[in-house]
UniProtKB/Swiss-Prot annotation:
It comes from the Bacteria. This is YcgL domain-containing protein plu2139. It comes from Photorhabdus laumondii subsp. laumondii (strain DSM 15139 / CIP 105565 / TT01) (Photorhabdus luminescens subsp. laumondii). Residues 1-85 form the YcgL domain.
Length: 90
């Protein structure tokens, strides 16, 4: 399975995986609007990989088959102040 990966010009560390390069036909219009004009990053073979840097490869494969795309968003930013206050309360 080969897929194309695009980065978002609007959202840092946000990537869109699609089945074929420049084919966004299965990506919802609202998602494309909030994502911005996709910036081509690379083509990769998922068959040759056991893992991906920022996504669960099995979830990516399933999403590509079922939906035709996968959206990778960055993990939430940890609120260090809340973590510190939680530790202080203990």
């Amino acid at each position: 399975m080969i897929c194309a990966i695009y980065s978002s010009p609007k959202r840092e560390q946000t990537y869109l995986y699609v089945e074929k390069r420049d084919n966004f036909s299965r990506v919802p219009e609202e998602l494309l609007k909030s994502f911005g004009q996709p910036q081509y990053t690379m083509m990769i073979s998922l068959a040759d990989r056991k893992k991906l840097a920022g996504a669960d490869i099995e979830k990516v494969k399933i999403s590509l088959i079922e939906q035709g795309f996968y959206l990778q968003i960055p993990p939430p930013v940890e609120n260090l102040m809340n973590a510190h206050l939680s530790q202080m309360e203990k």
